[in-house]
Amino acid sequence: RLTINLDMNHVDLERNNGLTIYGNSPKDTKIVRGIAAKFSDVHTDLSSKYSVNVNEIPSTAMPYNSDHAPFVYEIDNQPDDGMEYGKALVCYGSGSSEYHTYLDTMDRFNEESLAVSGIILGSFIRYLSYGERV
């Protein structure tokens, strides 16, 4: 149903404090946007420190530069009858710029920032599993 890519999702506070979550399903991004708003209300300590942007983009604009790409672009075995795209949510943090460079070391890693995407997307996964039950 959905691929969630949490690769390179930590924040480098020397660069900025942002996380970006984007996806190609209007329904999914709307739900995640609502979860992110609730996250800001409940986890004020983290939300005051880290900003979260949730964006919806068309399937044809999904980047083909990370692990989620085959699950978006390569699920249709017969594209001649009209391309069918897979759904994906992707989270990148400002720390992703160091990926595979000399700065990609654990001393620059910000484990606290992983809680932000973990709580938001973990809540979404729970929603997919159980619905709106409390």
Language model features: what each stretch is:
Residues R1-V90:
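Metal-dependent peptidase/peptidase-like ectodomains
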Residues G95-V134:
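His/Asp/Glu-rich mid-to-C-terminal helical/loop segments that flank catalytic regions of hydrolases
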